Amino acid sequence: MARKKYALIGAGNIGGTLAHLAALKGLGDIVLFDVVEGVPQGKALDLSQCGPVEGFDANIKGSNDYADIAGADVIIVTAGVARKPGMSRDDLLGINLKVMKAVGEGIRDNAPDAFVICITNPLDAMVWALREFSGLPANKVVGMAGVLDSGRFSHFLAEEFGVSVNSVLGGHGDNMVPVLEYSTVSGIPVSELIEMGFSTKEKVDEIIKRTRGGGGEIVALLKTGSAYYAPATSGIAMAEAYLYDQKRILPAAAHLSGEYGIDNLYVGVPVVIGANGVEKVVEVKLSDEAKANLQVSVDAVKELLVACKGIDESLA
């Protein structure tokens, strides 16, 4: 059987961590792409020299040529400018939209059969633009945010309830619309634990607020960059679900065609990821409060797309 091929577009902190994780897990050969000459080559060489020590034999290549991503089974896109302290995701829109155009065209021309995972921010707008520029089917282009948000939410809930993180399942969409009925501790919904007196709604609301600002909290602490370990781990989880046909339910920014009453937008929802990409959007029952919060998120995404179309008329 031919070895699988990963193309990682963007050789920054997330891209480098993705390459290391993919090699350690034996997921296949890796192309690390970046427009800056020397950076992907240097990181690829450094990572390759880990192989004899860590026991992997992945072929890791650094490249500045999109032709080298040809035949990739999975492409994970992290290219773009990272947030700096005081910078909002919306500030990134104009810069990263141009990056998505170049990346989308590179994928279209060299790896049109790949499953594409976008991590670049602002996520909901960038994954939409990437699909538009690449022309790939909507089920083969997805955004990574919900897995990361769920990981952060689960970590904070585990701290609150004093349990193992493995005992917590966080289920909620991108742009942070937590659905507490589907977030459980050892199988018990968080909403019921609040009713039982194990925590308070005020405390859980604080956790939700901290999760919403989870990326910004790390940016403020690092001062010179943004999170990369957890985002990379989340991207690999999505890639594995596709490559191994796991039919795994994961929260992701997926293209909606009427689900949740939303059409032609990328919004964070639970989806089934398997060998056909996004195989199904899981429509869970939402409370009136969750529906209202989801609509706020949808309206924010729509505003970003209007801005995108104003920047690049080909998207209109």
Swiss-Prot record:
Pathway participation: Fermentation; pyruvate fermentation to lactate; (S)-lactate from pyruvate: step 1/1
CDD domains cross-referenced by the UniProt entry: LDH-like_MDH
Molecular-function annotations in GO: L-lactate dehydrogenase activity
Sites where the protein binds NAD(+): D34, V35, V36, E37, G38, V39, N121
The keyword NAD is assigned to this record: yes
GO biological process: lactate metabolic process
Catalytic activity field: (S)-lactate + NAD(+) = pyruvate + NADH + H(+)
Record: residues binding substrate: R89, N121, R152
Keywords: NAD, Oxidoreductase
Family to which the UniProt record says this protein belongs: Belongs to the LDH/MDH superfamily. LDH family.
Protein name: L-lactate dehydrogenase
Protein's organism: Botryococcus braunii (Green alga)
Source organism phylogeny: Eukaryota, Viridiplantae, Chlorophyta, core chlorophytes, Trebouxiophyceae
